[in-house]
Amino acid sequence: MLAAITGSMSACESKPNDQQKVSKQGFYFDTIIQITLYGTTDEKYIDGCFDMAKKYEDMLSNTVSDSEVSRINAAAGKEYVTVSDDTLGLIKKGIEYGDTSDGRFDITIGKLSDSWNFSEIAENTDSKDNEVDASVVPSDTQIQGELSHVNYRNIQINGNTVMLTDSEAKLDLGGIAKGFIADKMKAYLQSKKITSGIINLGGNVLTIGKKSDGSDYTVGIQKPFDESGEPICAVKIKDKSVVTSGIYERYYRVDGKLYHHILDTTTGYPVKNNLYSVTIISDSSCDGDALSTTCFALGIDKAKELINSLSGVEAIFVTDDYSIVTTSDEYDVSTN
């Protein structure tokens, strides 16, 4: 999650119209969306973004019973399902990142994720440290059983139809859907001549242009497990996406042992390494979504190799001793 976004404007450097702004929140796909636009007070463009959020939630969510993704899951092992160009494009993007990550990012992880049930358990515990009873942890037999059905290569595409060849597989686009939707919102706003703004989809931050005074936006990266909400560092960006995956976002503890939601597709268990979070800076929020999870699973050394092989992408790693590691000095990363 991104801790803070600084978008204040200097009166002496901005034109009167640039002082105008409009900001609005909504709640979609179980997260808070906040959109702030500069140079306008008209809410209609934000409302247009919220309409898009609703459209894509109904299309892509596996918790919406008649979504295209849910229909693919219901037909697993039986038949092809006709889907929209948007759903098809996102599934292809998921397959692409499956190849890029050698399966560490896998959009057929649905049933394994369901077994761990991080979101519901973490949200419903009254414990300050998310301490829960050991009975909530799935058995190794269950984990290995679900893991055997995690394989993005079981996704078959024929024209605009999609099928899961494994009847026990379950598609889950949650790892890239928010980024995809953020990119769609940005394209829509730019088509309406919006030149300055911030789209925040539950921590997926995508900026449009620069601040209205011509300076960069400052995006704070949350200090893991810090309840104050203070950032551990901040990065200055313009017209970029900033996406973070961290173990502190959804987790629970059993007898003090932490179980987090970023699952290792080679073991079925939460990834074990020395990372607390990975932040990706990129042009595309969808790419940032997939890469943040992928890089976390790979660990710092292999993740740096991957990032260095890509154009226009950088990463910021926060380790379990709160050290900060970056892939380059291209961005101004300030620490507290």
Tell where the protein language model's regions lie, with residue ranges:
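Mature catalytic core of soluble alpha/beta enzymes
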Residues: M1-N336
